[in-house]
Every structure is written in C-alpha cells, then in structure tokens.
C-alpha cells in the first residue's frame, strides 16, 4: 500500500461492520502517529518531511520505509530515548519514555503511572488502572534492551552515524 492508500483506509469506514484500517505496519502505527490529528501535531510524516519530500501517492509503506519509524519515536515522539543513545540521559528515563509510548512495556520502578495514579513497581504499565492496558514485560527487560541497542549504536559509530545511514537508505 502507498502512504495515500493507508491515509484513506485509516479514515474511511468500510464493510458491513463499518470497520476501518487502524494500526498498520511493523510498529502498528495508528493514524494520529502517522499523520497527526490536528495541524501542528507531532507525527511521523511531519518529522520525515524534515529530511525528505514524500509523495504519498507513490511512496510504499514497505519494510524499508517503516525502518525509519524508530528514529521518529526516538527523536521526536519520545526524545529521552535518543538522548540516552547519545549519552545525555539515563537508561531509566529512556525506559520511562518507552513505557509512555507502548502500554505493554512496564514503567520503571518508582516512576509515576499515567495521571499519577500509581507508583510503578517495575511491572506496571504506565497506563495501569485504565481498565484496558497492562504491561507484558518488566521495565528491566526494556532497560536491558535499551542497553543492548546503545551498545550496537556505539559499536556502529554513534547515534549520528546510525541516523545518517538510516536516512540515506530512504534516498536509494
């Protein structure tokens, strides 16, 4: 599917149950994440436009294109993640940012959950208590994954080089 086809499918109700396409791709991106809800919202397409013009009617939402989404999440949507990879904040702050983005990731121990409802024990979703979301893995799992990712990034030559290389792949 092209970006334009996804935009249409995510805003058009189809079929007898009036269902529409909602979360798409490897990272299960919802309409607000890809396109924003209102003008001025942070969103993937707006972030990407800082680096390249995208013709939505031609650009496929393929695996290669979707590989750019981690950079968006790290830099724009949950900046503490990229700051950790650059050595400018703690792994706990990065893990907290992950928990805010993905309900299945537990908030780190002693961090507040959404609206300050609870203090996490390291196994609670940031959205605990909303009746819909629960963590599927502990904050320690996220912390370990972030540490491993940072090592890979550092071994590659640092965050800036990873970003540059990833963005260059889109232009090929």
Task: List each language-model region with its residue ranges.
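Short, structural beta-strand-to-alpha-helix junction motif
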Residues: 1-18, 30
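Catalytic and binding regions of secreted/periplasmic enzymes and modules that target cell-wall glycans
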Residues: 20-170
